[in-house]
Amino acid sequence: RDDVESRGLGDVYKRQVPYDLFVSGYNSEAVSKLRLWKAEMADFDMSMFNQGDYQKALSKNIISQAITKVLYPNDNHAEGKSLRLRQQYFLCAASIGDIVNQHMSVYGTLDNLHEKVAIHINDTHPTLAIPELMRVLLDDCGYSWDKAWHIVTNTFAYTNHTVMPEALEKWDCNLLKSVCPRIFSIIIEINERYCKDLWERYKDQAKVSHMSIVEDNKVKMATLCVHACHSVNGVAKIHSEIIKKETFKDEYLDTPTKFKNVTNGIAYRRWLYQSNEGLTDLLCEKIGDGFLKNAAELSKLAVFKDDKDVLDRLAKIKLDNKKSFAKYVKNQYGVVLNTDSIFDVQVKRLHEYKRQQLNALNIIAQYNYCLLYTSPSPRDSTSSRM
């Protein structure tokens, strides 16, 4: 294992320990590396422990372990927000430091970092990687602001996943300043230069205020991403249009070439080939196995849309999978599920903006619809929804 020195979170979080998982490619000799991080206390205070102050000696270790114990816990209170921010910065700092170290070992310079490395900001959680790379270039490597900013803005790309205002991540300036003061000062400098440039070009204070990265004593992480990244995309055509016409309208009008659409999908060899053996067998039988390397091959299924035999087999596969899941739930939790019901599943944290309550109301509405239109009498209905 390698140890990487962290900065910005104090002595408690001195050590960042990487743990690597190797992921093999499909029908190839390629192996990718997935690097995870664990926080550890740099040094155990044996002197304090020997003096009998066990609680204080161990408290630093407990706090350190909390950073990577549970990712993104509930943040509807001050402690949760602070821990979440510390987690974000810890992971960003560890990853940026690792990227820089590996690049330096090969090229001996960061002048060409943006030509050899692409860093993807997938939603706003890793946004602190932007000012962290600036910090490394400015403080550790002695780059000028303009040169460092050129490297940063040509290295990062941003994918936006939501346009709901309440889901666009914002951090309180006081909290950000207390957790990682140097990073906060870099963000403020980025914003001041950005707003100055906007004012010189538009002479419109309302526009400048709206496009500012800092507003109402909060740092708008999505706005920072849009400003600092050379590419900004939504995950569906309609989503990308909303980004351009509503959410980031002024930013789009200012830098239209960086906005694009990249339609989301699934890793189908993972979530189809590996996870759904029955469906994979049916697909291979009907259209061959070409879809395992080319997803466009799945369009060949269209000819079977009215094929009763195929539809019946598909229904059986779905039922078999539900039975398999119900068996797992019973064995693990002792809960019996009705496999004739519709399974409505959300792998999401419970939060207002996730709309779980709205989804629950929809389930009730569909249930009432089934009672009303699919049964001679509501008492005879066997339709339900999990």
Model regions and ranges:
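Single conserved hydrophobic/aromatic residue that forms the stacking wall/gate
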Residues: 2-13, 373-386
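Active-site cores of enzymes that catalyze phosphoryl transfer or operate on phosphate-rich substrates
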Residues: 6-7, 11-124, 171-235, 247-349, ...
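Short acidic, glycine/serine/threonine-rich loops at helix termini
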Residues: 48, 130-133, 160-168, 244, ...
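Alpha-helical support elements that line or immediately flank enzyme active sites
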Residues: 93-97, 132-141
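Active-site-proximal binding-pocket segments
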Residues: 127-129, 143-173, 195
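N-terminal alpha-helical segment
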Residues: 129-130, 343
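Substrate/cofactor-recognition hotspot
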Residues: 236, 241
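A conserved nucleotide-sugar
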Residues: 354, 362, 368-375, 379
